[in-house]
Amino acid sequence: MDQTFEKRKKVIYDFICDDFYIPMKVKEIATVLQVSKEQRRELQEVLDALVEEGKITLSKRGKYSKGQAKRITGTFQANIRGFGFVMVEGEDEDIFIPGENVNGAFQGDEVECIITGAPGGKRKEGKIVRIVSHQVKKIVGLYEKSKSFGFVRPDNQRYLKDIYIPAGKEMDAMDGHKVVVELTSYGQEHAKPEGKIVEIIGHVNDPGADILSIVKDYDLPTEFPEKVLNQAVRVGKDVSEADCAGRLDLRDWQMVTIDGEDAKDLDDAVSLTMKDENYQLGVHIADVTNYVQEKSALDREALKRGTSVYLADRVIPMLPHVLSNGICSLNAGEDRLALSCIMTVSPKGEVIDHQIAETVIRVDKRMSYTGVSKVLAEEPEALKEDEDFVPMIQKMQELSTILRERRGKRGSIDFDFPETKIELDEKGKPINIKPYERNSATKIIEDFMLLANETVAEEYFWREVPFLYRTHEVPDEEKIKKLSTFINNFGYHIHVHDEVKPKEIQKLLSQVEGTPEEALISRLTLRSMCQAKYTLENTGHFGLAAKYYTHFTSPIRRYPDLQIHRIIKENLRGRLNENRIEHYDKILPEVAKQCSDRERLAEETEREVVKMKKAEYMRMHIGEEYEGVISGVTKWGIYVELPNTVEGLVHVVDLRDDHYNFIEQTYEMVGEHTGKTYKLGEKVRVRVSDADKLLRTINFELA
């Protein structure tokens, strides 16, 4: 909308807000303001816009009055520059809050705001009118001591003010300590928040203090309660013959685990034999529920955590290590209890028969992704070392290829963004950063786990019992329209009828593969997708193009898997009666929400640790030059990604050879005088100019 329209809105709004105004119909307003017949349509549009913004109301009799602004409740997200946003649950678009309208709101507060406008048809603007509740109780930061008091500088830059620590509330913290501070006052516009120190994490330079600070900032648990540890220790260390009673005995089946070299919690093993022309694939999952009883201290703590969190220097496990690395881990040469999904798969990759059973297994060998990929590459040493397993591994790759092709044909989407592997020295300093290798061995396990998850989900969908599904909804229509408009600038199209199909997204990603705009379009496409979550209703998984999907294969590190194992075992034992069904109907909605929330929190924590360690690593390489690729272009600069997955920003002010303008349609920077362009996918040489570990930012300049 243009400026003229906005000015007219202001004139009409001021008129209706006048103390002498009485409610009028559109014709009456037109008469009083001497609006010509030709302009009445625009007057109606102005009135409609003001009604939509909540500034005025329209009565049943067609009269306009000053509106009682509708109050919207949401969560305040502060910005380092003083403004912020209110995020409203269920709404895709946040409400922008200018600095002068923040009204003392604190990062994370639950607030009420009113809409003040949507200038130029852009995002809604608002004003905070009430702080409903302060959600943040504790903050992590750096303690700075003075003679009679101290301050804590928050690590999270969204907390815009330092926290004042009065004398006697510092818990003997010293200058340079990383601390947790409990807020006692949230401050005023011109007064700092106050607090007391409740935990000293360690000195800022202590190994691991940086990652532990992020862990504390996200309020992740670092210790297990004593009751939980005691319960874990009491669990037996061996599988007895009594434990095996009534179970399908698969100890003579050839099977292996395939994991990363440093993995300790091995919760899945695989077996494969041929049955005529069909494959008999066994996916054998640790029977954790045998040791974690429902409603026990162990179970309550596992649900509270929801998931294990994998960070650069540590794992925050869902279950105590004595269980996750002990009796629950499918260690080679030891009897273990499992829940197995044994599938007969046709040469076309179709599951034509399956059995889910409680089993006892004995893994023959612990193998690594690296070792298996060497076998598949037919390296002589690897073939000799693993000669007993070579035929099975080769058949596994054969089946993996069939399954992957079958998923591809139905429209399964693979974004294939490289994950980052960070190597640390003994002091916690990053010494190397590189992309995680995704090889043929990782794909085998991925394909087999996906198949087991789909098979289990389909069986329990048709059984019509309470269950947890892993669902991924069809993308929002508006988001896909925006994506479609954007990719048209590059000559790509998405065919959307009633709703977009996975095949259309898959086709787009295939078309952009290897092009300069691949990274940007892939990222924007990913952002157009919904987030996967846990639900009781099976609505399918859009990204996998799967009608049925669940999480069955990782009960050591994910609570939803543990939860469905319980339901499956009760069903296998004939104990899933009306009372138990009623019980699951009652508890599963909260379990689904808790697990979805904890998963998002874990992902955010993992992401922040990676960003921090990348900045710390590049800080040690300031002045060095690298080859990179332009991965993003914005009005404030160009983003360049290095082969090691590190991404940094070349600020537009550092493009000194010309004045550059951002062309939004094609995501280019164009020099006004030289006509020089910087485009997506273009190779550039950059020099590291700055890296800030606290802000987790990296800056480059063109070399």
Regions found by a protein language model. Name each.
Residues 31, 185-186, 213-216, 220, ...:
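Electropositive polyanion-binding surfaces
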Residues 1-282, 289-335, 371-374, 667-669, ...:
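Charge-lined substrate channels and their catalytic hotspots, especially those that engage the 3′ end
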Residues 201, 701-703:
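Short beta-strand-to-coil "C-cap" segments at the C-terminal boundary of structured domains/repeats
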